[in-house]
Amino acid sequence: MSALDNRLFAKMNGIGNEIVVVDLRDQPAPVTPDDARAVAAHLPYDQLMLLQPARLPGTEAFVRIYNNDGSEAGACGNGMRCVARQMFASTDKQGLTFETRAGLLNCWRGPADGLYTVDMGEPKFGWKDIPLAEEFRDTRSIELQIGPIDAPLLHTPSVVSMGNPHAIFWVDDIEAHDLGRFGPLLENHPIFPERANITLAHIVDRDHITMRTWERGAGLTRACGSAACATAVAAARLKRADRVVEMTLPGGQLSIAWRESDNHVLMTGGATFEFEGRFDPALFARSRDKTSA
């Protein structure tokens, strides 16, 4: 029996990032990686957001996040906006706090209808915090390239942790490189012991960046909120962009503000409800049968 048997789910998207939200606050039984993969086989998604019973006072829930390959993610900005949208629909509160593997995340109703703001916390830059497999004193750019040594296709990325590892390659044209080909190679590069999200980014102006992301554990995605935060921060660290920027992703726009007062990164964007349904227990029974076989 799975904790997801007959459970109600909401299919949503955060500017194109495919999200499934399940409220399990009345269900302490764990959801397994096999369960997460079984859902993905039936209902394709980028992230599965599971609301589990709160573990800390003042929080609404512990949010466990699965990628579609069954691996866990510490943070998912687009997914958290979807969770916030669902929760705000049943409360008059202006702000909500959730616990994730990456720490506490605060969410607010945004500056306009349909927009939500998530405090993604403070970025980390130390090589052990990202983490990297070897020491780099300056993570604004590290020695990593793909392609010929004398003419690399991609090289010297910036690396940042937003509760999950990110590598950002600065390019003139984000469509000129086959991210579907290079993404998995870079995600699984030995320099990243926990794998990494891989982003191609182009700085249009000091307040505007375009980007595409190969998401760790999910693949090519139309949007990755934590990658947008990491990219904005990395550009500001290089002094090539301001601390408040508009990010253009294949799925839409995000506003990112790297606050000077506490170094927290605030992400504002939309969240769309698509439909709801219930999981068929047979879905998870088939998964268990395959595993036991």
Swiss-Prot record:
E.C. number: 5.1.1.7
Pathway connected to this protein: Amino-acid biosynthesis; L-lysine biosynthesis via DAP pathway; DL-2,6-diaminopimelate from LL-2,6-diaminopimelate: step 1/1
Superkingdom assignment: Bacteria
Any one cellular-component term (Gene Ontology): cytosol
Pfam family, one: DAP_epimerase
Residues of the active site: 76, 224
Site (Could be important to modulate the pK values of the two catalytic cysteine residues): 166, 215
Molecular function terms from GO: diaminopimelate epimerase activity
Alphabetical list of InterPro entries matching this protein: DAP_epimerase_AS, DAP_epimerase_DapF
Keywords, comma-separated and alphabetical: Amino-acid biosynthesis, Cytoplasm, Isomerase, Lysine biosynthesis
Protein family according to the UniProt entry: Belongs to the diaminopimelate epimerase family.
Subunit structure: Homodimer.
Name recorded for this polypeptide: Diaminopimelate epimerase
Lineage: Bacteria, Pseudomonadati, Pseudomonadota, Alphaproteobacteria, Hyphomicrobiales
Gene: dapF
